[in-house]
From Swiss-Prot:
Molecular function as annotated in GO: 4 iron, 4 sulfur cluster binding; ATP binding; metal ion binding; oxidoreductase activity, acting on iron-sulfur proteins as donors; oxidoreductase activity, acting on the CH-CH group of donors, iron-sulfur protein as acceptor
InterPro entries recorded: NifH/chlL_CS (IPR030655), NifH/frxC (IPR000392), P-loop_NTPase (IPR027417), Protochlorophyllide_ATP-bd (IPR005971)
Protein's name according to its UniProt entry: Light-independent protochlorophyllide reductase iron-sulfur ATP-binding protein
Gene that this polypeptide is encoded by: bchL
Binding-site residues for Mg(2+), renumbered to this chain: 16
Length: 275
């Protein structure tokens, strides 16, 4: 039975890069992994495949939206480490619903019966707006993971995600595994001071601290995971947190919780206390 993860976070903070590197770390530890990009930008799997692959929506358009005419090969591409990759895609700008597209991708995967062949399935989901469609992966997930940076906007989005997880947990099995601190900069960004305080208040923990490092940015633009970059101390520093997260997720009983969201004023107090 697959371990299903829903990875959320505010747009533009490195969520997809982090997810791809977690997928790579899991695969290198022997897991059979599927990563599903659930963002209209359809670039979630780029570090794994080195290409902007065809989306589910593009594939459906080619067969006039007849699901039964699609095969796995039409929508799944195998990338680094044997990780299978899929991109849901999105509707044309100004029309349709991106969340609906996520739901259609999930429906197609169910019809193809691919779930049971994987050890781990990761949904990489846009987390700025957790509407019904974009929250759909929480219906299937064992755990949610939030990617966040040490700033107000990211923490505000993380709190909204905690609200969605809390609400979904009343009907589904999903729990919050924890928060991954991304782009951690102890010189300019305060490290993880605000994230640590926020995590304590909502009843979760920081799973790992991914450093703010130029090498991670370079790997992203090169269409590679950090594990494919040249060996050296900098690479070791960057891949360490991804391996820590993979080890945690592959443990038999990873700790988790139903988060307790805080009020907006509480977030302002956290941020204001560190200015």
């Amino acid at each position: 039975m697959s371990l299903i993860l829903a990875v959320y976070g505010k747009g533009g903070i490195g969520k997809s890069t982090t997810t791809a590197n977690i997928s790579a770390a899991l695969a290198l530890k022997g897991a059979k992994v599927l990563q599903i990009g659930c963002d209209p930008k359809h670039d979630s799997t780029f570090p794994l495949t080195g290409t902007l692959q065809k989306t589910v929506i593009e594939a459906l358009e080619e067969v006039d939206f007849h699901h039964e005419e699609l095969t796995e090969e039409d929508i799944i591409l195998t990338g680094f480490g044997g990780v299978d990759a899929l991109e849901a895609g999105g509707p044309p700008a100004g029309s349709g619903c991106g969340g609906y597209v996520v739901g259609e991708a999930v429906k197609l995967l169910q019809e193809l019966g691919v779930y049971d062949r994987y050890d781990v399935i990761l949904f990489d989901v846009l987390g700025d707006v957790v509407c019904g469609g974009f929250s759909a992966p929480l219906n299937f997930a064992d755990y949610a993971v939030i990617i966040a940076t040490n700033d107000f906007d990211s923490i505000f989005a993380a709190n909204r995600l905690c609200m969605a997880i809390e609400q979904k947990s009343t009907r589904y099995k999903v729990k919050l595994a924890g928060i991954v601190a991304n782009r951690v900069d102890y010189v300019k960004g305060g490290g993880t001071n605000m994230l640590e305080q926020f995590s304590d208040k909502v009843g979760t923990k920081l799973l790992a601290r991914v450093p703010y490092h130029e090498l991670i940015r370079k790997s992203r633009f090169a269409g590679k995971t950090m594990f494919q970059m040249e060996d050296g101390p900098e690479k070791e520093e960057c891949v360490k947190p991804y391996n820590e997260i993979a080890d945690f997720l592959l443990s038999r009983n990873p700790t988790s919780s139903v988060p307790v969201p805080i009020g907006d004023r509480d977030i302002f107090e956290i941020v204001g206390g560190w200015q």
